[in-house]
């Protein structure tokens, strides 16, 4: 009787995994252990069209999300899936060293691409509750611009790296936060940035089939639009804009 119970339990535990293992994009060798864990913890017990468990599932699969989401039927099936239902990156805070980060990002480097864009005063006020003049009171570092304009500095590592390596590299550079994308792209974010920098994978060499390379002309506007969407203020005019817009034309 005990032997029969054992086989029943074994079958119940393996049957769901066996049916899922044949789904498109499921690497059984790589995903076996982590998928079993997520099944046991029931971290992925929902559908993309009702994704109340997406965050838990993402955390459970971790850096293997792209490789293993097919095993749990959690990969987007269409390109028009809502971005909120398509986890693209992992974020984290670091005990930053702004002076070090500003020094390292002041000049171009073979290992990363540096992007700077101005943060408008309205965003700082809505999120941090500061006065309009606070945004421009820089302490002499490379992230404070003239006329009250605060510059956000981010760097994109040129090569693909894993999530833990991304955090380590950003920490060693003195960044205040980081964003690691599930295609292997790593973004280190300076102290004056909101919403963990730019929510878009823009590493030059990662992934290899990337269609659009990083261009300084497009980043400021797109980064601002990303923040507009995040705070739901696409139609709201801020008190003032970038300042001297000619610099960005």
UniProtKB/Swiss-Prot annotation:
- The main location class comes to secreted
According to UniProt, the tissues expressing it are described as: First appears in stage 4 embryos, expressed in two domains: a broad mid-dorsal saddle and an anterior cap, expression between the domains is continuous across the dorsal midline. At stage 5, expression is refined into 4 graded stripes in the mid-dorsal region and a paired domain in the anterior region. During stages 7 and 8, anterior expression fades and the mid dorsal stripes are located between the anterior and posterior transverse furrow (ATF and PTF). Expressing cells become incorporated into the deepening PTF.
Keywords for this entry? Developmental protein, Glycoprotein, Secreted, Signal
Q: Which GO terms describe its cellular component?
A: extracellular region; extracellular space
Q: Which GO terms fall under molecular function for this chain's record?
A: BMP binding; endopeptidase activator activity; heparin binding
InterPro entries found in the cross-reference section: Tsg (IPR006761)
Query: Where found?
Result: Secreted
Q: Which residues are glycosylated?
A: 199
**PANTHER family xref list:** TWISTED GASTRULATION PROTEIN HOMOLOG 1-A-RELATED (PTHR12312:SF16)
Spell out the subunit comment. Answer: Component of a complex composed of dpp, sog and tsg.
The task this protein performs is described as: Involved in dorsal-ventral patterning. Required for specification of a narrow strip of dorsal midline cells that will give rise to the amnioserosa, but not for specification of dorsal ectoderm cells. Inhibits BMP signaling; enhances the binding of sog to dpp, thus enhancing the antagonistic activity of sog.
| Name the UniProt record assigns to this protein | Protein twisted gastrulation
């Amino acid at each position: 009787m005990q032997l029969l119970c054992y086989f029943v339990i074994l079958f119940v535990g393996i049957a769901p995994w066996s049916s899922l293992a044949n789904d498109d994009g499921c690497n059984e060798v790589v995903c076996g252990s982590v998928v079993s864990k997520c099944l046991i913890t029931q971290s992925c017990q929902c559908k993309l069209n009702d994704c109340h468990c997406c965050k838990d599932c993402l955390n459970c699969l971790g850096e293997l999300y792209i490789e293993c989401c097919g095993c749990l039927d959690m990969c987007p099936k269409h390109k028009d899936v809502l971005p909120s239902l398509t986890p693209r990156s992992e974020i984290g805070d670091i005990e930053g060293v702004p002076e070090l980060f500003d020094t390292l990002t002041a000049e171009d480097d073979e290992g990363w691409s540096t992007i700077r864009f101005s943060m408008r005063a309205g965003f700082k006020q809505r999120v941090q509750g500061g006065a309009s003049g606070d945004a421009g009171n820089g302490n002499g570092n490379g992230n404070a611009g003239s006329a009250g304009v605060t510059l956000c500095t981010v760097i994109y590592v040129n090569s693909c790296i894993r999530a833990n390596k991304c955090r380590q590299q950003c920490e060693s550079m003195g960044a205040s936060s980081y964003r690691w994308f599930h295609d292997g792209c790593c973004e280190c974010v300076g102290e004056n940035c909101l919403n963990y920098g730019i929510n878009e994978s823009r590493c030059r060499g990662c992934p290899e089939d990337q269609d659009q390379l990083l261009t300084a002309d497009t980043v400021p506007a797109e980064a601002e639009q990303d923040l507009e969407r995040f705070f739901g203020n696409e139609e709201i005019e801020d008190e003032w804009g970038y300042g001297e817009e000619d610099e960005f034309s």
